């Protein structure tokens, strides 16, 4: 799987385009539709997944409306064409936060739940310290060598972040 990161909008949100064969999944199209569409090119968009509904993660979503069907993901395993992943509900930053885990590839897309050397804010509407602690405990059970792609900033490993968020749980 090829992973392209596109930094979009005033809040420097990471949007990801995952490509297998000529198909792709777009994660968090926060803004700058043209930049995202340029990266998508002539690939077939099979899904657009939002890690949580804050404006900086959904700003370009309406531009894709003709290409998608609204669907609320629940915890569990999903297979869309050749893409296989798990959705893990990880509230804390916001009640609707999800983490997208590709087990075979050992990668996670965490939105604003986990960042490199930090975790998401809990003082915004929908944030919860107790939910964040539960979500961090849940994610801490996953393998250390998983690469974490967050909603802002640089990539990291789950091992590095476990060392950081152990202070919160």
Give each language-model segment a name.
Residues 6, 71-74, 88-90, 151:
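Conserved beta-strand termini and adjacent loop/short-helix elements that scaffold enzyme active sites
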Residues 48-58, 88-97, 149-155:
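Histidine-centered catalytic micro-motifs
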Residues 12, 24, 29-86:
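Active-site HxH/HxHxD metal-binding segment of metal-dependent hydrolases
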Residues 8-10, 19, 27-41, 65, ...:
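Mid-domain alpha/beta scaffold segments of enzyme catalytic cores
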Residues 24, 94-169:
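Metallo-beta-lactamase
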Residues 1-40, 99-111:
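Conserved beta-strand hairpin/beta-sheet module of binuclear metal-dependent hydrolase folds
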Residues 4-5, 86-87, 146:
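A short linear hydrophobic-aromatic micro-motif
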